[in-house]
Amino acid sequence: MPIEDVLLDLKHKIEKNLPAGVTITDVEFEGPQLVLYTEEPRKFADDGNIIRNLAKELRTRIAMRPDPRVLATPEDSISIIEEVVPKESVISSYYFDPDSGEVIIEAEKPGLVIGKHGATLREITKQIGWIPKVVRTPPIKSRTVKNIREFMRNNLKERKEILKTVGRKIHRECTSKDQWVRVTALGGCKEVGRSCFLLSTPESRILIDCGVNVGSDENMTPYLYVPEVFPLNQIDAVIVTHAHLDHQGLVPLLFKYGYEGPVYCTPPTRDLMVLLQLDYIDVAAKEGKKIPYESGMVAKTLKHTIPLDYEEVTDIAPDIKLTFHNAGHILGSAISHFHIGDGLHNVVFTGDYKYEKTRLFDPAVNKFPRVETVISEATYGNANAFQPALKDAEKHLQMVVKNTIERGGIAVIPAFAVGRSQEVMIVLEESIRKGLIPEVPVYLDGMIWEATAIHATHPEYLNNDLRKLIFQKGQNPFLSECFKPVDSHEARQKIIQNPQPCVILATSGMMNGGPVMEYFKAFAEDPRNTLVFVGYQADGTIGRRIQKGWKEIPMTGKNGSTEMLKMNMEVQVVDGFSGHSDRRQLMEYVKRMQPRPERVFTEHGDEKACVDLASSVYKKLKIETRALTNLETVRLL
Amino acid sequence: MPIEDVLLDLKHKIEKNLPAGVTITDVEFEGPQLVLYTEEPRKFADDGNIIRNLAKELRTRIAMRPDPRVLATPEDSISIIEEVVPKESVISSYYFDPDSGEVIIEAEKPGLVIGKHGATLREITKQIGWIPKVVRTPPIKSRTVKNIREFMRNNLKERKEILKTVGRKIHRECTSKDQWVRVTALGGCKEVGRSCFLLSTPESRILIDCGVNVGSDENMTPYLYVPEVFPLNQIDAVIVTHAHLDHQGLVPLLFKYGYEGPVYCTPPTRDLMVLLQLDYIDVAAKEGKKIPYESGMVAKTLKHTIPLDYEEVTDIAPDIKLTFHNAGHILGSAISHFHIGDGLHNVVFTGDYKYEKTRLFDPAVNKFPRVETVISEATYGNANAFQPALKDAEKHLQMVVKNTIERGGIAVIPAFAVGRSQEVMIVLEESIRKGLIPEVPVYLDGMIWEATAIHATHPEYLNNDLRKLIFQKGQNPFLSECFKPVDSHEARQKIIQNPQPCVILATSGMMNGGPVMEYFKAFAEDPRNTLVFVGYQADGTIGRRIQKGWKEIPMTGKNGSTEMLKMNMEVQVVDGFSGHSDRRQLMEYVKRMQPRPERVFTEHGDEKACVDLASSVYKKLKIETRALTNLETVRLL
């Protein structure tokens, strides 16, 4: 059936299901959802159940778009909204898009604009006709969030066209009589870096992640040139499980080589992704490396990104529904559940996950309506890869920082911008608040502050305890006064030239560049100071050398000459802050999965880790399993 | 390097290696070989070593093409050839192709035209300039062979263009830095029928077999629509391991859907392939089934077919060399050995094979210069799938026929046209010659006689004993007077209406149509007659029903009504004539393979057979192994 007929058919169905007197003028697909055009938005707003019932009946997501002719003027609308919405919500901006009939309201407390079960939103529509969409005013100013929102506002027309195209493609007719499901491993198998998988059926092709291995020139890129994925315009959708570069660093490259389809990820992943992609090409340029794509491709990616919240079942292809679930790894990280066909097969890509409650996140979800195949990460899959408990790691950190401060020293913590930094920040904030460590400034340098701002913008993606603290008690730990962003060369020099007891969190996490190096150079020779590692240090990095006990570190000086830096500062390795499940958690995750899966494939770990984990899953849990190899295709059904 | 530069480079190299005074005018690729153009064919013919040494030096196959201006006239040439060549060779025709400078000589005894180590051929060139190519005059008239030869002669120009294109594609430059080898299963895994595999590297894609499952509408076709193979113009070469329809029946479909490249197979496979393809679409049309392609596509396939003899190492892609070896299954059946890269990986596709000497063929070859991966058939892979020894099968057949004849009866043997028929013929001929069964006519009906004619045209592809019998003793068993082809409806009616003790071999092999049904109807009610099964009877066929013991067989009468046929004739099942290795032979084939392979994948058998064989190969031979699944891709390197 041609798509126009599908739409006509849907329109008839909807009209049959509408209450008497409520009319629509048209229907259209807009990305994964169906939108209804109406001259009577107020009637729809009158009864919150109309849309809900339609969505249930048609088993799809539905939104309503008012006719521009029935809308109040923006001026009138603003004064009405400010009457309807409680002042405490603190609205910071409005953006009216007559084309979609949406008004985007930025508020400090979005919940108050939404009202109970959306009652306030409906009231707004009833009075002004416009459909309000609410976003949070970032509690910490974020350049990234601001730029993304502006960019999206400036490209609404193009965006609408993209969504229309995507929507019509998703809802095309299924044509094949065959039924099969395959997964092709394109990167990240028996290795870490360049994660990339293709999920395919006779109808559809879905790419899951498209990472870059920044540590390798030879194996930097997934095998994107194989016929299963190339030409890229045959791909239906790209899924990004989380924002780390080894999972999404080359998504813009797909657009450079002809991909034109949607990118699905959670809203925080979208924001972090833009931040990390721009930083990636920026760093590559500064290091004189080949830049795989220009910032224009980052923008193009953003234009094509469709954010999906956790637990939102979404059609992404004629025969595939995607649902994201919390993965507990970093902000917005998602376990991706694919429901294929009408009950044909269910496959879960875990992406990176943490099966333990951490300071920031709930443990990864492992309860699904159905699941036959699991493709699981295996970073700590080695038989003996146990990590200390988080509580112990935290105590260790507290002790190290306390000792350093008390002897008048400075604790320098190299950290990745996204993930462990925020975890460590929460621990430090609580320790200071509770008096467990002295009240000293915690400096945040590099992208850490910006990444933290993005965390603060998406509190819904943090765990229960943190959300309670923020929403109910009004205590946002990220806003604590102990945190001091370092936002200029001068600010950094001030800290260096007038050293006082403090904690410094700075990038990069493995000391292969970034502001952390300046602090290190300044503070390495004083034995009162401490260098605290909270993350994994790869071979070949300076961090690794220091861990090995090097006492003299060669540094490139200002004029290019090599100077030897004397290491007198204390070195402490605090294990246990990993965002990955350790061996025990990996096994528990599978063991406690509901329902029990039929087979588990392992990936994202060195060869031994992947094989060890697979072998144990088979031996201990009696589940069919295998470590995947790049470039192989497995048949799931 | 552009291909023109490659050729120029080759020309310089050749000129440097030529003896003083011998010159060439040009070089060009022609399929997998390099051809030299010269005005001095006589000088090349003078010294047989010139071409041989060049081929060794350049590690490629080389042929020489004389300039048309230096050739004798056809008339003069014929009289000179007839002076040079012994009369006993019995030349039946000449075809002069001035474009290639070749003269095709058809002779009853090609060996006498060739001379020792090609001495007579060289003498011919020395005297007339033309390059002689010798083919055998079919000892039994074969419509197929005649038509193919005529067709090829009539399309020499187009053929030359095809070979040039193929040759230039084979010798293109390798561009990828990656090194990997993959095999994708497209059909024939955990099933029999529609065999099809894709062998791929970063440089090349080779399709091995493209069969049709004639017994199934649903699973008739391999998975050709997947992106690894489609669009088909990206495939470098198609290999046909043998002529049965489940291995080659859909090769013409590839051309219908855009394939334009070469098809490699042995010369007998080519001839049998044309016969069986034309019969396949003919039968389908008669049965009112959908015809997958027209005869024009059979012709197109033939135009693109490049025959290769056993043991001939041939470049088929920039990084792949193919060598066929005897598989012992049917005439021309080949084990395909692929050497990939410069010593990178070696993979053997067994196709169907018999690892035992039979009346017609030597046992399948399992000695290779190198081999890492084997993809083996598993038709009789079941743990208990043992077949009686051939000797016992032959004795059983002799006894059955003897008893039938001696009681004045007729032995009706349903048989496939290609394979078992000729095996049974040889046994019957010898039995009659040696007086083990009475001297009665052996009628051959259906395509059996035509297929036998193709066997007689290619005696080089029969085993040592048969070749000796034919070439040294001048006894071609296929020419025995006991064999009586039935070539018309009238001839068949004569046999039926005046029944005399005799043997009748007729198609189809499973009694689902064909002339065998007319004999069956005529002779089923007389208990003196015997129905002798020598091949497998699939479920749902009349043959299978009779084997199960049905005593009344429903038959469609002339006016479409169903008549019940009373089964009074004796039924005998003679096991052991299979062209497939039985379980013991499959295991022995792998066990005695030299060198020992690193891994074995199984295919071409029902699921249990494939899994059983794989499991035993692992347990008993300690070789990594797995039963392949359709649509999966395995990484070999």
UniProtKB/Swiss-Prot annotation, chains A, B:
Keywords: DNA-binding, Endonuclease, Exonuclease, Hydrolase, Metal-binding, Nuclease, RNA-binding, Transcription, Transcription regulation, Transcription termination, Zinc
GO biological process: DNA-templated transcription termination
Gene3D superfamilies: 3.30.300.20, 3.30.300.230, 3.40.50.10890, Ribonuclease Z/Hydroxyacylglutathione hydrolase-like (3.60.15.10)
Region (Beta-Casp): 384-578
InterPro entries: aCPSF1, Beta_Casp, KH_dom, KH_dom-like_a/b, KH_dom_type_2, KH_sf_prok-type, MBL, Metallo-B-lactamas
Tagged with keyword Metal-binding: yes
Binding residue positions for Zn(2+) 2: 246-247, 352, 604
Cofactor(s) essential for the protein: Zn(2+)
Presence of keyword Ribosomal protein: no
Ranges for region Metallo-beta-lactamase C-terminus: 579-637
Pfam families registered for this protein in UniProt: Beta-Casp, KH_2, KH_TffA, Lactamase_B, RMMBL
EC number, UniProt record: 3.1.-.-
Binding positions for Zn(2+) 1 per the UniProt entry: 242, 244, 329, 352
Cofactor binding comment, as recorded: Binds 2 Zn(2+) ions, which are required for nuclease activity.
GO-annotated molecular function: DNA binding; exonuclease activity; identical protein binding; RNA binding; RNA endonuclease activity; zinc ion binding
Region of interest (KHb), residue spans: 72-139
Region feature KHa, mapped onto this chain: 4-71
Stretches the record annotates as Metallo-beta-lactamase N-terminus: 180-383
Function: Terminates transcription on the whole genome. Termination is linked to FttA-mediated RNA cleavage and does not require NTP hydrolysis. Cleaves endonucleolytically at the RNA exit channel of RNA polymerase (RNAP); the 5'-3' exonuclease activity of this protein degrades the nascent RNA released from RNAP.
Family membership noted in the UniProt record: Belongs to the metallo-beta-lactamase superfamily. RNA-metabolizing metallo-beta-lactamase-like family. FttA subfamily.
Subunit structure: Homodimer. Interacts with RNA polymerase (RNAP), interacts with the Spt4-Spt5 complex.
HAMAP family for this protein: FttA
Listed name of the protein: Transcription termination factor FttA
Protein species of origin: Methanosarcina mazei (strain ATCC BAA-159 / DSM 3647 / Goe1 / Go1 / JCM 11833 / OCM 88)
